[in-house]
Amino acid sequence: MSGDVVARDHQWFEEALCEAVSLFTLKQLASSWEHSPPYPHWKDYAPAFREYAERLSGEQHRYLPLGKSVAGWYAENREVLGSSPYLREKNEFLATQLTALLEKAPGSLGAIGYLNLERSSFSKSFEAYLESWYSCCPEDIRDFAMRVISLFTRGDHDGTAAAAVTVSGGPPY
């Protein structure tokens, strides 16, 4: 690679985060524009945003088979993700899991801005990369990073193994 482009072992995760934010934003726009569009004649776009988000969210490759966890999925796909970060179906699968986390705590979207603050985190293991992200986040938005870590280590969405909620088998809504 040349110029300012940095090869990252965890680019696949960034791709999934971008897709998650896109899906989350589509859903937010649908809700917001339904009641308060920026211009009155734009209100008609709300259902189109919602339908598009639902169509994307409903794609079967975005969901785990019942009984599997994200942690298990990651263990099976770790090598291929690191070597080929643009595998759309794998990125979209993870994006759906991350979107579920964002929907539970919409105020934590700002945590994404703290990813990659430590330049040395690019070459760390994925676990250390996530821990670096967590430590860079201000305390009031660290919860999102912790939930992501929990997703990869235990497979749950809420940060506690006892109350694991894995988005499996189909759309969560």
Per-region residue spans from a language model:
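Active-site catalytic microenvironments for nucleophilic, acid-base chemistry
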Residues: D4, F24-Q28, L101-K104
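Pan-zinc metallopeptidase signature
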Residues: E59-Y173
